[in-house]
Amino acid sequence: MVSYAGIWSRGATSDRRDPHLPEHTLLAIDAGQTGIKTRLVTAEGTAQEWLFPGVLTDRPLLSQLTTVVAEVTRVTGQAPHTVTFGVSGLTSADDEADALMPHPDLAGVHRIVVTHDSVTSFLGVLGDQQGAVVAAGTGVVTLGVGPEHSTRVDGWGYIMGDAGSGYWIGRAALDAVMRAHDGRGPATSLTSVVQERWPDLEIAYVALQSSHDRVRTVASFAAPTAAHAASGDEVSTRICHAAAAELATAVLAALRVTDAPADAAVGAIGGVFGSDVIRSAFESAVRAERPDARFVAAAGSGLDGAVALAGLESGHPLHERFAERTR
């Protein structure tokens, strides 16, 4: 897979033909909750990028996606031939594709490809390699690809899943602080962190439960937990090691279910892996069961993965995870 980021600047034209360029104008869309990133790539080798506000997963996706296509079409004066979508919060690629294709804002589009953003993240990180990619931020999702099949592990939300995520770590930190407060658990330096936000710990739970932003608030304690682990706080260290074990379990499950080779590639992305304590423990846990696993740096971004999605061969194991419509 070719990573266009870093090769094409906004509006720049290459002086040689890249064999990986699309045959027709391609609009790649990486629709995440932080922002909707787009890249328009032409057959002549030019590329332009735009950034739009992030996806709101509690609202219908259709209008949020069509608005982006309509705006790019307006700015460029011509509808793209192909549009690829990697979308956070997507529940059914087929249903979304069926709704997108006949929409008036896509009237000039001839082909669309729709998938969950875990797929475009995988393609951006590992390209066409077999292996697993775990993306751990506020939430977490792991995607595995083997010789014939692919699988999704976790990503089931903060109530039913997301083990090892930023929310999971933050929730464990708050639990540890309250255990230290009422005598059920050992003292922890995290207590001072929580008291910076809620000086009176005994009413903290009321403020948190009534907050409309409680998931993000809980997840915000993940970073200080990692920092305190690095400074030697035993409680924080246990939490981070437990998170690493959960993330490793997800990756190992993905590799096992897909019959990935012994030397499969493993990519770990997202803010949680900014912690050396977590990353090191995660890699050790994976290697304990998969000693030949290869930990690789990301080859590209989710937007690069959305570009690659357009050229994915029909027999690729990830083909079962996206919907394609043409006219």
What are these language model-derived features?
Residues P53-L56, A70-V114, L123-L126, A265:
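Short beta-strand-loop/turn "lid" adjacent to the catalytic site in phosphate-handling enzymes
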Residues V2-T76, V125-A132, L174-R327:
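ATP-binding/phosphotransfer module of carbohydrate and carboxylate kinases, centering on a glycine-rich
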Residues L62, D94-D98, G166, R279-S280:
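Conserved strand-to-helix beginnings and helix N-cap segments that scaffold or border functional pockets
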